[in-house]
Amino acid sequence: MVSGYDLTQLLPEKGFHLARALVGTEGTCATILEATVRLLPSPRCRSLLVLGYPDVYRAADHIPEVMEAGPIGCEGLDEVLVADMKRMKIHPRDTRLLPDGKGWLLVEFGGDTKEEADAKARALMARVAGGASNKLFDDAWEEEKLWKVREAGLGATARLADGTETWEGWEDAAVPPRALGSYLRKFRELLDRYGYQCALYGHFGQGCVHTRIEFDLTTREGIAKYRRFVTDAARLVVSHGGSLSGEHGDGQSKAELLPMMYGEELVRAFEEFKSIWDPDWKMNPGKVVRPHRIDEDLRVGAGYRPPEPRTHFAFPEDDFSLAKATRRCVGIGECRKHEVGTMCPSYRVTKEEMHSTRGRAHLLFEMLQGDPLRGGWRAEPVKEALDLCLACKACKGECPVNVDVATYKAEFLSHYYAGRLRPRHAYAMGLIHWWARIASRVPGVANFAMHAPGLARALKWIGGIAPERKVPRFATRTFRAWFESRRSLDAGSPRVLLWADTFNNFFHPEVAQAAVEVLEDAGFQVAIQPERLCCGRPLYDYGMLDLAKRKLRQILDDLRPEIARGTPVVGLEPSCVATFRDEMCSLFPHDEDAKRLREQTYLLSEFLVERAKGWTAPRLERKALVHGHCHHKSVLGFDAEQELLRRMGLDAEVLDSGCCGMAGSFGFEREKFDISMTIGEQKLLPRARACPPGTLLIADGFSCRQQVEQGAGRVPLHVAQVLRLALREKAPASPPARRRRRHRVRRAALAAGLLTVALGAVLLARTG
C-alpha cells in the first residue's frame, strides 16, 4: 500500500522500524537527508513475452496465472492507449510489434543465462496456449522498442483526440491482482456513467492502473463533477480491497478520501504520528493528514482564463496556445534523473530545480499568470532559469508529456530582447552564416586572425567567446565551390537536394563531399540549395525569431518548385534537419509547403534506409563508438542511423552519453564554457578518450565533433565519412596529425604574407 502512513512498521513484530514508517509520508513528518536502501540483484539476462487478449479485462483476469510463473515484471495496456499512440505518431512502428489483440501483457523474465530466461517464458506460453496470442522476443532492440511503447503511456494520454487536456486525480489506484479484472470492468462502467474516456494501462502485476481523465477543472460544474467521480471511484477501489494510490502517493488529490479506506480511528492515528514529528504542523501542510479538500487550491480552478499573448511560434500541438503549452508539465520529475538519457543536461550540473524541465515550465506558467511572478516577458527569474537551457530538445523527446523548453526559450528571448540589444555572443554566433560567408572569401586571413595569440583573444572578447574555446578553422575551399566545379551524375537519375548547411559548407566540406559520393553510389543525382538559403538554426538560441522566420520564408519561396516535385531534401547536420521537421511548421502552421517540406526532409541515414531501395550499404567490419546529436535523438529518432550501421556490418556501440555540452553555440559563450565542459566530462569525453585507436568514433553533429576534438583530442567522423570509407575499402588516415601539419604550414605562410603586407603599408605611409 502507498496510501496513508505505514504504521504497521511500528508494531513489535516489525521491530518498531521508524525509517520504514517514514517511507511514503510525503515530507509531512521529516526531511530525509540520506537513506540506506537494500538492492535486489538485477538478472544478467532477460526475455520479454508479450501476450495479446481480446480485451484488457481478460488480460487482467490472467494476472494471477501469469504471476505464478515468477516474472520480474508484468505491465498491461489496452487498445485505447495504442490507438492514442498511433494518432499522435508516438512509436507508430513499434506498436506493430504487438501480437494480435486489444489488450496486452508485457511479461519479463530474468535468469543467469538467456536460455534460463527463455525457458521461463516458454513455460508460461505453454500454460496460456489457446487463451492468448503470444510473441517471445529474443532481439534486445525489439524488446527496448516495446518497453518504450509502455513508457510512452503518459505522453500518449496527455490529450484526447480533439485536444482536450487530461488530468491526474485518479491516476494510480491499485487493487489486489486477483481482483484486477473485476475492478477494470466496473471502473469502465463508472467512466461511461460520467461520460469520461481514458486508456487503461499500468503495473498490472501489482494491480496498479494508470489513467488520465478529461476532468473539467475550470468551471464550477466541472469541478463538482470531478469531486463526485473521484468519490465514487474511491468507493469502488475500496470495495475491491484496494488502495487509493498504488504508487504516487496521496498528496492533496486523494487524502481527503483516506477515511473511506482506513476509517476515522486510523486516520486519527496518522494525525498523532505526524504531531510527534511535526508538532507545529509546518511540514508540507494540507497533505495526507488534515488535508485540503480535493476540489480546492487547484492549479487552474473555476474562472481560469489565462492570457494569450501574441507569439512567433503557433504551438499547433497545444491548440495554438502558449498558455496550454506551459500546462504540459504534470510534475513527474523525469527531468531530474542523473544517469540515463539526455534530459536535462544543465540540471545534472547545477542540481537546481529551476534548471530542470519541470522548473522552467512552471516558471513560464507562473509568468503568464502574473502570480507570483511579475514582469511578464521581462521577468528576470524566467530569464535566469532559461539562460542555462542548452536548447538540446531532450525534453521534447524524453519528457513523458513532451515539454519543449527549447521552443519556449526562443519565444521568451524574442520578447525579452524586443527593442533591446542582445549580448555580444548573440550577434557573433547567431549570425554565423553571414560571418562564415564573409570569411570564406579570405579563409587564410580569417584563420590567422582567429588563431594568432593576441588578436584571437581580442576577437573572442569582442564576440563574447570563451578564451579557452578553440575556434574551428574555415575551409580553404567551401563545399559549394567544390560541388560547382565538378560534373554531377547523369540527369536521368532520381534527384535529391543535399542541404549544404553552414557548418559542413564553410568548415567541414569533406563531410558534404563524402555525402555526395555516397548518394551518387546509391544512384541519385545530387543538387544543392541556392547559396543564400540557410535554415537559421543558431538564431533560435538567441530568440532572433523575426530573422529566423525570414530565413525560412526564403527557403519556402525558393524551393517551392522542388517541394511541388516531391524532391527529397537530405541533410547532414541534425539540428538543421530538425528545424525543417519541427520549428518550421510551428512558425508557419498553415503553409502547406512547409508541411510537405517537413515530410520530404531526411537525415542522410534516414534517406538511405527508407528511400534508397535496391542499394546495398557498403560493408565495413570495424568497431565503432557512436554519439548521437541531441536533436537527432529527440526530434528525428536514432533508429535509422543504428539500422544503417547494422547493415554496414559495424560492431557499433551507441553511447548513452547524454548531451556533449557544446549544444551549438552554448559551449562557445564565455560564461558557459565551464558548464559546457562539465557536461561533456560526465560521460562522453571520458569514453572518447578511452576509445581504442582502431575503433571508429562517429558523431554526426558539428558541435559534438568540436567538443570531442577539444575535450578528448580525437576527431570523430560523420556517418557520411564512414560510408565513404567503406566504399573506398581502406582504413582512415590520421585526421588530427594531418590537419595540424597542414594548419602549421598554412599559418606560417599566412603570417609571413600578412607581415609583408603590414611592412609594405608602413613603408608606403612613411614615404607618403
Predicted regions span which residues?
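Noncatalytic alpha-helical scaffold of FAD-dependent oxidoreductases
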Residues: 1-202, 207-246, 250-339, 345-346
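Glycine- and acidic
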Residues: 43-49, 102-110, 164-175, 210-218, ...
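Short beta-alpha connecting loops at secondary-structure transitions
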Residues: 45-49, 168-170, 217-222, 252-261, ...
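Short coil/turn segments at secondary-structure boundaries
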Residues: 77, 136-139, 158-162, 247-249, ...
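Non-catalytic terminal/interface segments that mediate subunit docking, oligomerization
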Residues: 120-122, 134-137, 144-200, 221-234, ...
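Repeat-solenoid scaffold signature
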Residues: 255-263, 272, 276, 386-420
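Iron-sulfur cluster-binding electron-transfer modules in prokaryotic oxidoreductases
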Residues: 278, 285, 406-768
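Iron-sulfur cluster-binding cysteine motifs and their immediate structural context
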Residues: 285-287, 328-366, 394-413, 701-703, ...
